Amino acid sequence: MAPLPATAIPPARFGRAMLAHFPLEAGAVYLNHGTVGVTPNVVLRARSALLDEIERHPARFMIRELMHLGLTPPPRAPRLRGAADEVARFLGVDRDGLVFVDNASAGVNAVLRSFALQPGDEILVHDHAYGGIVRAAAFIARARGATLASVALPFPVHDPADCVRALERAITPRTRIALLDHVTSETALVLPLAEMAAACRARGVAVLVDGAHAPGAIDVDIAALGVDWYAANLHKWAFAPRSCGVLWAAPDRRRDLHPGVLSWGVTSGDWLQEFDWTGTRDPSPWLAAPAALDFMRDVLGVEAMRGHNHALALESAEMLTRHWRRSWTTPQSMVGCMVTVPLPERFGTGDPATAQRLRDELLERHAIEVPVISRAGALWVRVSLQVYNEPTDLERLAGAVDALR
């Protein structure tokens, strides 16, 4: 593990004391960082300062300082590109390969809408994929006369290689593009992405990654994964303000890639210009992304933060399943900062309506925010762990579930 920066908080101080850095409601047990993130106070202040700066002279900032629209002499250092360059370094990609988008869904949609699907082609997804993305893929496939196929990945899972083998069996001669997750949303699994991407490449299938839950939660080196596109959020585990996402494309995939909203840059031949300006919008979440990276590096220490969150995730799974007398088989290599564990057997096979009722009761009666899901004939809780969480939060969750009927 790399040494902590001199200003970083010692890992022993992670836990409830860290709530001083976040604007979370007092008294709440927040075990749902993964859904939309929580922005640290210092990053919110950085964003507020950016908004103040913009409003002092909006036209000058948006037209002359934010980026080069081709309408004025280019600024020496366009602010948006400067922020994107810092994020690119964090994710291990070249500066010309990364653009900001509102969220991972926007990035995935841009790729799917730009991809040259023909009638009879196939988009391959998996059954752990985020529902909104699956619906978008189905819509685009229908519009092009293509089909959407889904591969069943194991859950519960015992071996990451089982995911690779399932994917290999699902690829057909018609498969043109596969949509893979880096970290699955409901089931909270870190997939063996490099191996799954290699299986696709060997069969001539392009790979689009939904990395919504990855940056900040696990080590991300996009260039080493061997994928064609990677869409991600920075407002979840990387502490940026909402909404802040990124999209990376391999060099040979950039020329034909276009944003969902076309504007001045569409005839420029410059994909960066196309994505950087899609019309007037609030750029402050994107420009505040470097402040979020600074918070991770200089205040928390990236490795210390991930180490705490990962260890607490494993402890959560062990403690909750022992308390509820359930089993949990996920390999440690497939765990990041979240775990999805089964609720007690007395809740039965469950259904989405029961899951929603239990989630509402946990929040309204016990001030615990945690998703409850219905899957594989059981009810589960997905527990997200961040530096402000500690074992007592899990004890409160266990006791609250015991009180549910």
Label every model-predicted segment.
Residues 1-405:
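Pyridoxal 5′-phosphate
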